[in-house]
Amino acid sequence: MTRLQEKYSKEVIPAMIEKFGYKNVMEIPKLEKIVINMGVGEAKENQKVLESAVSDLSLIAGQKPILTRAKKSVANFKIRENMALGCKVTLRKAKMYEFADKLMSIALPRVRDFRGVSAKAFDGRGNYSLGIKEQLIFPEIEYDKIDKVRGMDIIFVTTANTDEEARELLRFLGMPFAQ
């Protein structure tokens, strides 16, 4: 059992019951999955760029990413249908908790001028989206071995029904929200 899973079962569940007054244990929101997406726009000219993005993402997430492809051809963007344009990873269970722990305790504090993540990035259904501008904040990525600084989107999918419940869940888990 990971450190964050233990924290969830020992501290977060009682705190959520106290705050929201749940009657049933199954009502308590929990993390369902974390999706990490890396869109690589320059992959349309050079497919080799995608390989380094895939290797970076596999180091960060700890599992092999799948390629995301264009659904339709768009002449203005010079993309064809089924052309690989990025990669994504879906983390669940233990790997999800390990990644969330690493993100909150190690990676986010390494961001320059970090004052906390925005508390407004909820989608209305209890899911939280977070954009990261550079992959260098993760300890697995070595500065000398990257070809280009890339950003990524990280989406926390929860079972919460409202944004307020999801915000409290992530806050109890240790997400550093800006005041």
Swiss-Prot record:
Q: Which UniProt keywords apply?
A: Ribonucleoprotein, Ribosomal protein, RNA-binding, rRNA-binding, tRNA-binding
SUPFAM superfamilies according to UniProt: RL5-like
| InterPro entries associated with the record | Ribosomal_uL5 (IPR002132), Ribosomal_uL5_bac-type (IPR020930), Ribosomal_uL5_C (IPR031309), Ribosomal_uL5_CS (IPR020929), Ribosomal_uL5_dom_sf (IPR022803), Ribosomal_uL5_N (IPR031310)
GO MF annotation, one: structural constituent of ribosome
Question: Does the record bear Transmembrane in its keywords?
Answer: no
Q: Name one GO biological process term.
A: translation
GO CC terms in record: ribonucleoprotein complex; ribosome
Q: Which cysteines are joined by disulfide bonds?
A: none
Q: Which Pfam families match?
A: Ribosomal_L5, Ribosomal_L5_C
Q: What does this protein do?
A: This is one of the proteins that bind and probably mediate the attachment of the 5S RNA into the large ribosomal subunit, where it forms part of the central protuberance. In the 70S ribosome it contacts protein S13 of the 30S subunit (bridge B1b), connecting the 2 subunits; this bridge is implicated in subunit movement. Contacts the P site tRNA; the 5S rRNA and some of its associated proteins might help stabilize positioning of ribosome-bound tRNAs.
The record's note on quaternary structure and interaction partners says:
Part of the 50S ribosomal subunit; part of the 5S rRNA/L5/L18/L25 subcomplex. Contacts the 5S rRNA and the P site tRNA. Forms a bridge to the 30S subunit in the 70S ribosome.
Family according to the record: Belongs to the universal ribosomal protein uL5 family.
Q: State the name under which the record lists this protein.
A: Large ribosomal subunit protein uL5
| Protein source organism | Clostridium botulinum (strain Eklund 17B / Type B)
List the lineage, top down.
Answer: Bacteria, Bacillati, Bacillota, Clostridia, Eubacteriales
